[in-house]
């Protein structure tokens, strides 16, 4: 598996992965940037990919790809300067398509992105996941994550689409 810059060339594979998620939100894929776009349309998809690669956005997006197949996404947010990022989402978000899970892809991607975080001057990063996501908790801990707390559901979290308790882990990026 390699982390690559998002590309419109993977449209068909991305659509297949999206279907595995039921056409819903994909963690780490920054689909929120596509509001108003039809990602099944190649032109709209290419527009969204350009947004992902826009240097003016304070985030770095990578796609997990193997043999030309889209397997998932991981996003490194350079700052967590909003209450939602600081409390619920953190510096790094990721997701692996259901058919590719259990192969260590998330762990590999997170380790690589931790190096990127260190290179841009982040000495530690916040990584959050749902309390009921045992696989993600295992990935985060395997990469050095230390649980700070579990944020319980309230009006603020619900207003940001988070309806389950959120585990908040810090990971030191220094080697």
Question: PLM features: what roles do these ranges have?
Answer:
Residues 118, 135, 157-159:
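Short secondary-structure boundary/hinge segments and terminal tails
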Residues 1-91, 95-98, 116, 153, ...:
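GNAT-family acyltransferases
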Residues 117-128:
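Conserved GNAT acetyl-CoA-binding A-motif
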Residues 112, 129, 152-153:
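Proline- and acidic/polar-enriched loop/turn elements at helix boundaries
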Residues 141-151:
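Conserved acetyl-CoA-binding loop of GNAT-fold acetyltransferases
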Residues 93-96, 102-119, 137-142:
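Conserved acetyl-CoA-binding loop-helix of GNAT-fold acetyltransferases
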Residues 127-137:
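Conserved beta-strand-loop-alpha-helix junction that forms the acyl-donor binding cleft
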